[in-house]
């Protein structure tokens, strides 16, 4: 009996170990539920990073290999509470899932932006606005239904294997800015009006979705039929002996 259960568990784990772009597609946000990718975080026309109400992170992915990230982090200072630092980061680009299940994200170098507030360092009254480029490699990830909230949850393992805070599906299709370069530097660079049109088109699918509706029943059907098949074979073997 235990051998049968072991075979079933092993087979299910093999079926489950199938990372793909389709299951990543959508906009994911952290528990604060205040940080989302898209024009509500970064305005590429007027070069503005917009501060959310609370810190948090958000990632968006498309099924054809594009991503966007919005990060708002606050770091306290235990020696002086007035010296807390805050940073807003926007990046977008392309991503790929490697054969080992790791996730590699390559940003468009000219588009990354960072807004740093460091009252006891850089300036007490001004924030520092700069370009930002940081490729990202996540060791692994998995998508599952959160047992508490019933929402789809994305759990990411960072490059060192440590767990990132869980992310929950907020938008599907993803809420993103245009996936091409927003700030091209060549002679064919876009005017602000053409960029505005692109941003407007990118918002056509701006609507919320309950993550429960995005539950991937098709994938879990694989588990069911795999388990039924193994149990059937094992039962037949026991009967014949």
From Swiss-Prot:
Lumenal side of membrane: 18-222
Keywords linked to the UniProt accession: Endoplasmic reticulum, Glycoprotein, Membrane, Signal, Transmembrane, Transmembrane helix
Compartment(s) of residence: Endoplasmic reticulum membrane
Claim: Membrane is one of the keywords in the record: yes
GO molecular function annotations of the record: unfolded protein binding
The keyword Glycoprotein belongs to this UniProt entry's keyword annotation: yes
Topological region Cytoplasmic: 241
Gene Ontology process terms (BP): 'de novo' protein folding; budding cell apical bud growth
Chain ranges passing through the membrane: 223-240
Source organism, top-level taxon: Eukaryota
Topological type in the membrane: Single-pass type I membrane protein
Protein name: Protein ROT1
Gene name of the encoded protein: ROT1
């Amino acid at each position: 009996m235990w051998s049968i259960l072991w075979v079933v568990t092993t087979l299910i784990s093999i079926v489950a170990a199938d990372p793909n772009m389709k299951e990543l597609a959508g906009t994911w946000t952290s528990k604060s539920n205040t940080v989302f990718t898209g024009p509500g975080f970064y305005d590429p026309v007027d070069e503005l990073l917009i501060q959310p109400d609370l810190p948090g992170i958000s990632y968006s992915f498309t099924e054809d290999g594009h991503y966007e990230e919005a990060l708002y982090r606050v770091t306290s200072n235990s020696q002086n509470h007035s010296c807390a630092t805050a940073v807003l980061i926007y990046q977008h680009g392309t991503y790929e899932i490697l054969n080992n299940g790791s996730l590699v994200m390559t940003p468009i170098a000219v588009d990354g932006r960072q807004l740093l507030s460091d009252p006891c360092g850089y300036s007490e009254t001004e924030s520092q606005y700069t370009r930002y480029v940081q490729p990202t490699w996540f060791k692994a990830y998995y998508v599952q239904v959160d047992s508490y909230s019933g929402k789809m949850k994305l759990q990411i393992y960072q490059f060192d294997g440590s767990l990132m805070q869980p992310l929950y599906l907020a938008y599907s299709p993803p809420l993103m800015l245009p996936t091409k370069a927003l700030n091209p530097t060549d002679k064919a660079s876009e005017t602000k009006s053409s960029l505005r049109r692109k941003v407007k088109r990118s918002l056509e699918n701006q609507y919320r979705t309950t993550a429960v509706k995005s539950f991937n029943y098709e994938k879990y059907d694989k588990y069911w039929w795999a388990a039924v098949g193994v149990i059937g074979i094992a039962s037949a073997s026991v009967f014949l002996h």
